[in-house]
A protein has these predicted regions:
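Mg2+-dependent prenyl diphosphate-binding active-site environment of isoprenoid biosynthetic enzymes
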Residues: 1-141
Length: 144
């Protein structure tokens, strides 16, 4: 799929400079997502995750490909100036984190028919999410 995507992209009718800048961004997005996956797997081996570590995973793994990458790639292909690209980058990271938090909420309380994801799967897999972290830190002994 990646190779086909690259092939389609390189044959698209954009100026060569824009293509190169965009390919660099796409490669960075893939790299960040990979780093996020490594961080996420590493969190799975820890007994207790810290909020800052979970948020770092969200920024690298989720925000890079759901919000930051697509917005920046689109802006670069549209010929946006560096200042706008930087503003989009800054805007998109917290948006991607919010997306992941919402996904985690739906994973615990959503309707499987709507989400396509089994309710409680993160909990059963021992995944350390912000919701679970805060429930363990702030919940009563009964809630934990």
């Amino acid at each position: 799929a990646y190779l086909l995507g690259y092939e389609l992209f390189t044959s698209a009718k954009f100026p060569p400079t824009q293509k190169m800048q965009t390919l660099v961004e796409i490669n960075n997005m893939i790299f960040k997502c990979g780093v996020g996956e490594i961080l996420d797997v590493n969190l799975g081996y820890r007994k207790k995750a810290k909020e800052k570590d979970i948020l770092k995973v969200h920024r690298y793994k989720t925000a890079s490909y759901t919000t930051e990458g697509p917005l920046v790639v689109g802006a670069k292909l549209a010929g946006a100036k560096k200042g706008l690209v930087q503003k989009l980058r800054l805007f998109s990271k917290p948006l991607g984190v919010a997306f992941q938090i919402q996904d985690d909420i739906l994973g615990l309380f959503g309707d499987e028919r709507e989400t396509g994801k089994p309710v409680g799967s993160d909990l059963r897999q021992g995944k350390q999410t912000l919701l679970i972290l805060h429930a363990l830190q702030n919940g009563s002994s009964k809630d934990r």
